[in-house]
Amino acid sequence: VILSAQFTADLTATGQNTQHLYFVSRYEDIPQMQRDLSGDRPFSRMAPNFYMYRIYDIQNDSRFWKTFRTKHKVNANAPSAPYVKGDLGIMYVVNQPGDTRFSANVLNNSPSVIYTPTGKTIPHVYVAYKSGQTTDIGWNDTRRYPSLSKFMDGSRTAGFNDVDGLRDITLARSAETYLIAAEAKVRLAKLGTGAYTDALPYINPLRARAEYKNAESRSVYYDGGGAPSSAPQT
């Protein structure tokens, strides 16, 4: 982070950060689920398009899994049998056109989708591309989509309905600065000054940072859902 608008845990200060409200999909209106602090309070105003989901090399680029929340655990006070709290309750399948594994875009308790650790079906599965589908309509619903997790704020002190976030707002990131420099090199190359490869010293460091490292756990990542009051944005 190069520049941020800083907020404080002092609730008597003027103004708080409400940015966390707008990027999260609805989950609390689904059976087996209820609103909680880590899931945030979903106003669901901003959802990525399919291009944004598909631009990543999902196998090797850690940024996808560290940017989008694709699973929710069952958290209802009295979940219906055979489910218990902590079971996988919601899963978004971010697949590609041509995938023939799924018969529908919405699969509820489908025997075709089993969560291996528990041997149970998953109550709610939302698939981007069902078998035979090539158009981007799998999540054609303003409520259901993998949530951008970068702005989640678990540091809110008044509970899960609190709208007043405490995390800083990032105004300028180092990665964006690198990409602006790379774009400048590309534009110069188009004008005949320099080469396109001059952009690589600015692009490759970002690729190196984003790739999964040796022995890095792919199932563990940080998002703001469990953030302490002083949690930085990364």
State each model region's role:
Residues 1-28, 137-174, 187-200:
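Structured, solvent-exposed acidic/aromatic patches
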Residues 1-118:
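An aromatic- and glycine-enriched ligand-binding surface/loop that stacks and positions planar moieties
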Residues 62, 66-68, 150, 187, ...:
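Acidic, mature catalytic/reactive cores of soluble proteins
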Residues 89-159:
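Amphipathic alpha-helical assembly segments
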Residues 173, 179-180:
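Short alpha-helical basic/polar micro-motif
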Residues 193-234:
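A long, glycine-enriched binding/interface module in the latter
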